[in-house]
């Protein structure tokens, strides 16, 4: 399974999340997943909300276009981004 898949104009990301990091960033590959560090703690859905906001900003889409498909309660997540207007360089290289 690939970390990043383009499906019918949507982007499907298999992510490994590192909560409580010093800053928000796309770290790179972590096995067959893309590692994303976020500053929010994994308490009461704060990390998921922060992840959605961070990805929406990175891909220049509304938060409503970022859907967590799998992994609501874990570090391993599958996220769909509907019709991204921008693809960060770290992810664009994985699509090639």
Curated annotation (Swiss-Prot):
Position of the signal peptide: none
InterPro entries: DUF167 (IPR003746), YggU-like_sf (IPR036591)
GO CC term, one of those recorded: cytoplasm
Superkingdom, natural source: Bacteria
Family membership noted in the UniProt record: Belongs to the UPF0235 family.
PANTHER family, per the entry: UPF0235 PROTEIN C15ORF40
Protein name: UPF0235 protein Shewmr4_1190
